[in-house]
Amino acid sequence: MNVYSALKEIFKQNISCSSENIQLEESLGRTLSKPLRINKNIPEFDTSSMDGFAVKKSSLGKIVRFKILGETAAGADSDFVINPNECVRVYTGSRMPKNADFVVIQENTRLEGNFIHVNGYDKNSPYVRKLGLDFKKGQTISHPILIDYKLISALASLNFEKVSVIKKPRVCIIPTGNEILALGSKAKKK
């Protein structure tokens, strides 16, 4: 049987791959075998994507001096509600104050006691990661999909400990023919 006929016979076979459940940290480079349903929004709330000061965007341009009400560290709750002339110190990953929708990055501010002076800002860059930006509750991650670092990070934040992946195939290579030589052998000339 020639190579092309053999390949044709192989491809006629209905080869299916079974799946296995493995620890998330072992899944890099593997292929997801079942869809995953997302059980919560990621991020779970609006967060700052930069270190700076949370303000109301509508206040920018009208007001250049803002009173600092306090700060919200990453991982902490924020009960702050700001007025147009107020701000809250935020850090990357911090929860945004309930009615703030813009972060003036710290490089564009000057500290004056308990106030900041805004030196400039890019109105097209609010530096806010909105609730559900990465994943929305109820969303499905389809399969098959190659699991990379980004997906592992997201699944870890969603508390997935195990994932269902396609089992690694067992492959055998069976060389045949006189072109195969033992190590150290020399090919015969015709």
Predicted regions and their residues:
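Short, low-complexity N-terminal leaders and the immediately following helix N-cap/first helix
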Residues: M1-R65, K130
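Short, glycine/charged-enriched hinge/interface segments at domain edges or termini
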Residues: A54-K190
